[in-house]
C-alpha cells in the first residue's frame, strides 16, 4: 500500500498540467461530461482507465469519482450520512485500503505486554493512545507508521486507589471511573487532577459530553454530574436503576442518556433517561432473558445506537421506528459474550468476544461474520476488553497485552 502511494505521487510529479491534444475525441469532452461518464465506472474499470496515460491517471484519481465507491466500502472515513471524517487523505487511497478490511488482510503484532492480568480500557486521540493499567492511565505516542508505540508513556494520570474500570476523553479532560467508587477528572495538558466520591461501590462506566458527566455503578444507581471546575462532585441527579450498571452513553443531542444494566433486578437492560430531569423516557426491547446484561453501548446518531453483552448479540436500535424491536442484530457464532464494539459510522462493525482474544469484523449489510481473528492461544485465553480502530489499524486490549492488526502493511 505504501509503495502504491509512492508510485502515484511520483507519477503525479511528472504528469502534464493539461490533457493531451492527441487521442480519441472522447478525451476532448468538457471535464464535467467526462466526470459524469466516469461516474458509472466501478473500481476495476477506473483502475484500468488510469493505466491508459498519465493525464487519465490523474483525472481518474479525482475524489469526486471515488466518493460514491468509498461510501459503499468498509472503513473509508465516511459516515452513513456522507460526512467525510478524513478529508485530508485522498479518497482513492482509502478505497484501496478498504479492500484489505474486506478481505481480512492484516498483520497481527503485539504493541505492549504487562506481567499481571489486567482489565484494560483505552481511547485514541490524534497520534496518542491512552490505556488504563491498574489504577493508572498511561498516555503513549504513536510512531509515524501507527503500528508501533514509543514504549515509554509521555504522561501518567493517577489518583484512584483501585483499578480504573473505564474512562473517556472529553475535549481537554480525561474522566475516569474507579473501583474505589470515585470519579477522576484529569486535564490532559496540565497536572490538574481531581477525584471525588461518586458511588458506594465501584464505578463501572462513565461518559462525558457537553460539560455533563454520567456514571453507572455496581450500587445500582446512575448519576449525573457537572464537569465545571467549580461544581465538581455536586450530584445533579441520582437514578435508582434496580440493577448493576455496566455501560452508559450520552446522546449526541445532550438531552438524554442510555444505561446498559445487568438484567438481574429489572426486566429491561436498556433504558433511556432524561438528562435534565433524571426521569425514565423509555426502555428498549422486550423478553430479555435474566442475566442478559449489556456490557457496551454507543450512540451512532441521536436516533440510532448499538448494544452488546452477555446474550451474545449485537443489536442496532433505531428510535424512530421502534423502541421494542431492534432493526438489525448479529449473533456471536460460538455463543460467546460480546465485551465491546466499535463502528466506522457506516458499514463496518468490530466486536471483541469473551474467549481467545477473538476480534470479529462484520459488514452491517449482512448477518454473517466477515472475518475473525484469534489473538490468544488456549492457555492464555482472554476476553477482548476494549478495541478501537482507524482506517489503517485496529487495536485490541487483552488481559496481558495490547495487539494491533495492521491493515496498511499486511
From Swiss-Prot:
Q: Which domain of life is it from?
A: Eukaryota
Q: Which InterPro entries match?
A: F-box-like_dom_sf, F-box_dom, SCF_F-box/WD-repeat, WD40/YVTN_repeat-like_dom_sf, WD40_repeat_dom_sf, WD40_rpt
Q: Does the keyword Ribosomal protein apply?
A: no
Q: What SMART domains does the record point to?
A: WD40
Renumbered ranges of WD repeats: 159-196, 198-235, 289-327, 333-372
Record domain F-box: where: 23-69
UniProt keywords (A-Z) are: Developmental protein, Repeat, Ubl conjugation pathway, WD repeat, Wnt signaling pathway
By its UniProt entry, which SUPFAM superfamilies does this protein fall under?
Answer: F-box domain, WD40 repeat-like
Membrane-spanning parts:
none
GO biological-process terms attached to the record: cartilage development; embryonic digit morphogenesis; limb development; positive regulation of mesenchymal cell proliferation; Wnt signaling pathway
- Cysteines joined through disulfide linkages: none
Gene3D superfamilies assigned to the protein according to its UniProt record, in alphabetical order: 1.20.1280.50, YVTN repeat-like/Quinoprotein amine dehydrogenase (2.130.10.10)
Check the record and name the CDD domains matching this protein: F-box_FBXW4 (cd20090)
Function summary: Probably recognizes and binds to some phosphorylated proteins and promotes their ubiquitination and degradation. Likely to be involved in key signaling pathways crucial for normal limb development. May participate in Wnt signaling.
Q: How does the record describe its quaternary structure?
A: Part of a SCF (SKP1-cullin-F-box) protein ligase complex. Interacts with POUF51.
Question: This protein is called what?
Answer: F-box/WD repeat-containing protein 4
Q: Which organism is it from?
A: Mus musculus
Amino acid at each position: 500500500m505504501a509503495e502504491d502511494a509512492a508510485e502515484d505521487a511520483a507519477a503525479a510529479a511528472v504528469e502534464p498540467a493539461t490533457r493531451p491534444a492527441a487521442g480519441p475525441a472522447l478525451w476532448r469532452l468538457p471535464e464535467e461530461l467526462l466526470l459524469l461518464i466516469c461516474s458509472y465506472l466501478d473500481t476495476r474499470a477506473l483502475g484500468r482507465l488510469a493505466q491508459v496515460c498519465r493525464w487519465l491517471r490523474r483525472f481518474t484519481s479525482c475524489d469526486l469519482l471515488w466518493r460514491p465507491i468509498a461510501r459503499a466500502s468498509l472503513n473509508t472515513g465516511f459516515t452513513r450520512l456522507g460526512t467525510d471524517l478524513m478529508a485530508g487523505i485522498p479518497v482513492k487511497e482509502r478505497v484501496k485500503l478498504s479492500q484489505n478490511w474486506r478481505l481480512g488482510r492484516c498483520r497481527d503484532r503485539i504493541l505492549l505486554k504487562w506481567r499481571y492480568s489486567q482489565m484494560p480500557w483505552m481511547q485514541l486521540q490524534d497520534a496518542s493512545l491512552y490505556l488504563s493499567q491498574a489504577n493508572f492511565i498511561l498516555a503513549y505516542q504513536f510512531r509515524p507508521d501507527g503500528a508501533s508505540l514509543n514504549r515509554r508513556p509521555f504522561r501518567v494520570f493517577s489518583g484512584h486507589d483501585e483499578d480504573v474500570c473505564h474512562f473517556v476523553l472529553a475535549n481537554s479532560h480525561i474522566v475516569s471511573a474507579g473501583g474505589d467508587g470515585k470519579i477522576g477528572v484529569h486535564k490532559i495538558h496540565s497536572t490538574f487532577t481531581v477525584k471525588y466520591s461518586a458511588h458506594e461501590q465501584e464505578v463501572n462506566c462513565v461518559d462525558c459530553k457537553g460539560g455533563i458527566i454520567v456514571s453507572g455503578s455496581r450500587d445500582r444507581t446512575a448519576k449525573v454530574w457537572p464537569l465545571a471546575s467549580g461544581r465538581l462532585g455536586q450530584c445533579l441527579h441520582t437514578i435508582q436503576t434496580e440493577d448493576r450498571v455496566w455501560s452508559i452513553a450520552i446522546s449526541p443531542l445532550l438531552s438524554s442518556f442510555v444505561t446498559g444494566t445487568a438484567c438481574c433486578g429489572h426486566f429491561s437492560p436498556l433504558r433511556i433517561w432524561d438528562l435534565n430531569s433524571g426521569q425514565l423516557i423509555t426502555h428498549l426491547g422486550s423478553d430479555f432473558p435474566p442475566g442478559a446484561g449489556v456490557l457496551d453501548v454507543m450512540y451512532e446518531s441521536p436516533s440510532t445506537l448499538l448494544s452488546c453483552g452477555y446474550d451474545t448479540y449485537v443489536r442496532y436500535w433505531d428510535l424512530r421506528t421502534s423502541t421494542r424491536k431492534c432493526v438489525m442484530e448479529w449473533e456471536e457464532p460460538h455463543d460467546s459474550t460480546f465485551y465491546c464494539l466499535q463502528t466506522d459510522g457506516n458499514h463496518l462493525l468490530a466486536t471483541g468476544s469473551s474467549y481467545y482474544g477473538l476480534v470479529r469484523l462484520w459488514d452491517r449489510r449482512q448477518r454473517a461474520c466477515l472475518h475473525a481473528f484469534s489473538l490468544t492461544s488456549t492457555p492464555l485465553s482472554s476476553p477482548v476488553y476494549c478495541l478501537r480502530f482507524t482506517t489503517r489499524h485496529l487495536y485490541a486490549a487483552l488481559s496481558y497485552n495490547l495487539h494491533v492488526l495492521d491493515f496498511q502493511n499486511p
